[in-house]
A protein has these predicted regions:
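Short helix-capping and inter-helix turn/linker motifs at the boundaries of alpha-helical repeat units
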Residues: 39, 154, 201-202
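Short amphipathic alpha-helical segments with heptad-repeat character
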Residues: 110-117, 216, 224, 228
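Short, surface-exposed helix/turn micro-motifs that flank interaction/cofactor sites
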Residues: 53, 80, 87, 168, ...
């Protein structure tokens, strides 16, 4: 009697199930394997991107496939897929035969913040118009909780990303969310947070408060203006950071 299943060991005879059942089981298993592989690729991508964002791999750092696989406990195939994806997104660039973390020059930095101000301002405007009451309450709670993180720039930076992501989602515009995801992935190349600059944390929380207040009031113009002002001040702080770093290297 022949048996149906992976490697002939599923435990159900062909007499009972028939050949079609074997085919179905094989297809289902194939889909499960594809899902697992896609999950691994996604996880490897996220792990590497988070490591860049947290400064573990700074601009100019070489990304070695075998080292990444060992660090994250992932096989080399999903690591390779993730590196290819990051290269396509220009977060990694080729230097000879090596892949290195990309860096942003002054013009690229200015372009990034200009696009971010436009898109995030629009997201805030749309959130004021379309956000559910529950979403607005979540934003309010975030501001209250984040104020307790002043003094911990790394934790506040993570909270800041969650806050901005919540505004993106509250816009209820999937195409805008997609573009903002790309912008924020590129922000990972900055490696350091402007919230570490003295006084910036308190100021940023106040700016978040103004954004949420405008969204609560359903005032799209005010929400747009508050978000743009927030990005403008963040860019100004970033420029000071870059200038200070350049002086340190001189």
């Amino acid at each position: 009697m022949r048996w149906c299943g992976r490697n002939g060991g599923f435990g159900m005879p062909l007499v009972a199930l028939g050949r079609s059942a074997c085919k179905v089981e094989t297809i289902v298993y194939g889909k499960l394997r594809m899902t697992e592989e896609k999950s691994l690729h996604k996880d490897a991508y996220t792990l590497i991107l988070d490591a860049i964002d947290e400064g573990l791999y700074r601009p100019g750092a070489r990304m070695v496939e075998s080292e990444l696989a060992e660090r994250f406990g992932v096989s080399r195939t999903p690591i390779r897929e993730a590196l290819q994806r990051l290269e396509t997104q220009r977060l990694l660039i080729r230097e000879g035969r090596s892949l290195i973390v990309a860096s942003l020059d002054h013009n690229q930095l200015a372009e990034l913040y200009a696009v971010r101000a436009e898109l995030e301002g629009l997201a805030a405007r749309l959130a004021a118009q379309h956000a559910a009451a529950e979403e607005v309450r979540v934003l309010r709670k975030m501001v209250e909780e984040d104020s307790r993180l002043i003094g911990d720039p790394a934790a506040l930076a993570r909270a800041n990303r969650r806050f901005h992501k919540q505004i993106h989602l509250a816009s209820h515009n999937r195409y805008l969310v997609r573009q903002l995801d790309l912008v924020h992935r590129t922000m990972a190349l900055l490696a350091t947070t402007s919230l570490a600059v003295e006084g910036r944390s308190q100021t940023a929380i106040g700016e978040h408060e103004a954004i949420v207040r405008a969204i609560e009031a359903r005032d799209g113009d005010a929400a747009d203006a508050a978000l743009r002002a927030h990005i403008s001040r963040a860019f100004e702080t970033r420029l000071r950071l870059v200038s200070a770093a350049a002086e340190g290297l001189a």
